[in-house]
Amino acid sequence: VPKMGLVFGEPGLGKTNAILWWAIQQDALIITAKNGMTPRWILKQLVSDLGEAPKILVTDLFEQAVAKLVENPRMIIVDEIDYLINNTRAIKTIRDLHDETGIPILLVGMGAVDKKLSRYKHFFDRIVEIYRFIPFDFEDVKTIINTLSDIPFEDAAIEVVYQKSNRFRQIVKIILKFENLAKTNEYKIITKHIAESELL
């Protein structure tokens, strides 16, 4: 049974933080794809992350990775899969690892990666779950602020933050800015007026 998933969305929506959290929960291996990454590079990193000394030849590396993953199955997360889209051999290596070991593989990418991956029919057919990260709504922003901020925000101030940004990375920066501002000015709460004066 295929066990591949795809998570994608625009930058700044919290994909990386979500997969790092998920990787810790699942004891998963993370491979962060890079421009020009080859099958050998992928396998060498994977084998190293599995605690083995990588062999030289790609075929030996592949067998080494498969043996280790069969012995101790661990989910693999491939972040920045976009970098591998035009590398058929790299895509096939990931597919073959999945097929040989049966381990779950989660692919993480940007905006239209689902459409780009769909051109690899035999690969894309193995993806059983697809989740798209979308910008946050007001309630999401409120939850993030209330969870992460050391200083409370009025709902009207949260609305100002929401209008300014609904992407995770930017919201975290705004929270840090207001925490520092509150500490410096001894604010007990972030009001709409404070939020507007700093963000608008």
List the predicted regions and their residue ranges.
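Short regulatory helix/loop adjacent to the ATP-binding pocket of P-loop NTPases
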Residues: 113-128
